[in-house]
Amino acid sequence: MSVSIRRWVVRHPVAAFLVMVYVVNIAVALPSNLTRRDLLPFGFAPYDLLGHIVGSAVPAFLVVAAVLGRGGVRDLVRRTLRWRVKVRWYLLALFFVPVASVLAATALVGTAPLEALGDKWPLLFTVVLPYLLLALFSNLAKEIGWTGFLFDRLQNRYAPLKASLIVWVPWALFHLPGFYEETGSAPGALLLLGLFAIPQLCSRVLVAWLYNNTNRSVFLVGLFHAAFNTTTGPFTREFIPATAEDQFLIQIGGIIIAAILIAVITRGRLSYGPVADQREQPGTITRRVRS
């Protein structure tokens, strides 16, 4: 990294992170699109996984290294690997979304989801669990950048709820290439962007609350993200027998309600407060707020 670029990164760490994320994300989305059209081998998964790692985690570590040096990098690594948290947070991260989905589906379509769970429960181990493990690897890489670096830095300056709102905008745009892959058209991608805008905002609020309650554990946030994607993917396909419209409402309903309740109960603070290893970051104003 040249001296001039390093100086710019130090002065504008958030902008530097986002520039790198978007450049890499677009670059990786291209081969992913080509493999879907059988123009590149191996299928799209290797390129998608590479994009999650190189596109979010690597920029975060590069910026942290430039701004905070080795101490900052060690701190981010510790938070990424922080797994010693209370059992209740593991239960919440893993089971909140699937349980809420089953309850919402039961309210909408009757006992069919419960019957599907009783009849096809082996799929929880043969289909759902393998997907969850792969999703944990890829989503942990994303959360290193978006929560471990970006949100963590912004909540020190703006407080957590406002920081969640700020992160939400680039986070939503980050998904545009994926929406384009799914729909194959720009209008379709923009439509999905609009449909998922509010659920994505609410998910960022829940992520912030979970992060602050687990001593800034990026690992637990990645686990929650993986459980969410697993629920909206194979779990819903196998155990939520409903129309596509009902499935969408089921998936987002619990997230929206939970985010609103948490924001109201914590008065927007999302359990933010001082932690033992929190570091002052250059160019930020650190606030101490009681949970």
Model-derived segments and spans:
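Membrane-interface helix termini and inter-helical loops of multi-pass transporters
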Residues: 37-43, 108-119, 180-188, 237-244
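Residue-level signature of the transmembrane alpha-helical core
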Residues: 22, 54, 94-95, 128, ...
